[in-house]
Amino acid sequence: MPPAQEFKLWLMVYFGDPDKHWTRHIALFFQAPEGKPHITYHVKKVNQAWKLEMLDEYDAMKSINIVGKVSLGNISITPMQLKQIMESVKIINNVGDNLEDDDSSCQNWTGRALQALEAAGYITAVEVTRGIDGMVDIVHEAAA
């Protein structure tokens, strides 16, 4: 197994369209040291179903759509271990278009992903709480 890689873990919040609290998009950005590839995980709707997407070598910090971010500290993990954990996070696909009450949102998936990282021993319960609380605060800065 390759050695673990150091990443700085960020919870990224992006403007929605329209920018409402239920349309703001969330991703987990694993920022690598200079010269190493970054990794971003998020879920997005594809043909009315949520799908996991991994972006490598994408620098989420350079997006013009960032509305806020939460630093969750450093994490030491191999990209393969990270992939296995992210792929294990349940994706819920509710039927309907009511995004306000949709448990299948990227926001809820991100909370479950943080909990999966905690269960695997990569982050602490305090970091999970800080991530979820920070996400909720930034998301609710949007118009209702």
Give the positions of each predicted feature.
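Non-catalytic ligand/cofactor/substrate-binding and regulatory segments of enzyme domains
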Residues: P2-S104
